[in-house]
Regions:
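Peripheral, non-AAA+ core regions of ATP-driven protein-machinery
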Residues: 4-16, 21-39, 45-223
Length: 223
């Protein structure tokens, strides 16, 4: 049997042939502000990542469509986000352009269907930490305001609009730094508790802001 064993030489050039892993790269943001497109921060098995969240509105009856291989918890977060934005619209905190009002007797969010998508659809995604990211995408769509491309965020949101703490902060902020993000919005509790664990290189080159509610998120995210 030993005679049939062949020697294999592994070096830098052929290493990828023996690794069953994709090369993990984080793209830098392109500098273009867009309506309904937000940079979220995610934790993965190979480190942090910048997760794009997209939202569009289509004339309809207030239905919500979710795509991108989202898990149950993330779908729940999207529904919570939509409810939070509805409340903010009703309270007048999110201003709706006149051109978007199809029927003055109908709530604007009942005149459109909303579609939220998280690209890289073949990759399963789950967890509550994209709550403020999805909320920002929806707010952008209904206010017709663009989202800053140099801002990224992570945080769970509840029905009262409070921003709740998340896990994997160190990895997420390192990913934001690699993507050339200038402002990272994180839950205030994480800011107070976990900022000491973040590398100085990240803290020195990126503004990290702790937010306690969604009103603060909008102040930094929309232009």
């Amino acid at each position: 049997l030993l005679e049939n064993i062949k020697k294999v030489s592994i070096n830098v050039k052929n290493l990828n042939e023996f690794l069953d892993k994709k090369v993990f790269e984080i793209e830098k943001h392109d500098g273009e502000n867009r309506i309904g497109q937000v940079n979220g921060l995610a934790w993965t098995s190979v480190g942090g990542d910048v997760l794009k969240v997209e939202a569009i509105k289509i004339k309809g009856k207030g239905e919500l469509t979710l795509t991108g291989s989202l898990g149950d918890v993330m779908k729940e977060s999207a529904r919570i986000a939509f409810s939070v934005i509805k409340v903010l619209i009703d309270e007048g905190k999110i201003k709706i352009p006149k051109k978007m009002i199809l029927d003055p007797k109908t709530n604007v969010y009942d005149s459109y269907n909303l579609h939220i998508h998280v690209p890289d659809g073949a990759t399963p995604k789950d967890g509550p930490s994209a709550g403020i990211t999805m909320s920002t995408a929806i707010a952008s769509v209904f206010s017709d305001k663009k989202v800053r491309s140099d801002v990224a965020m992570t945080g769970e949101i509840d029905l009262a609009g409070n921003v709740l703490p998340i896990g994997g902060l160190k990895e997420k902020l390192i990913a934001a730094y690699k993507a050339d993000i200038k402002i990272a919005l994180i839950p205030k509790k994480n800011y107070e508790r976990d900022l000491k664990d973040i590398p100085d290189e990240v803290k020195d080159n990126m503004k990290i802001i702790g937010v306690k509610d969604f009103d603060e998120v909008l102040k930094y995210a929309l232009v």
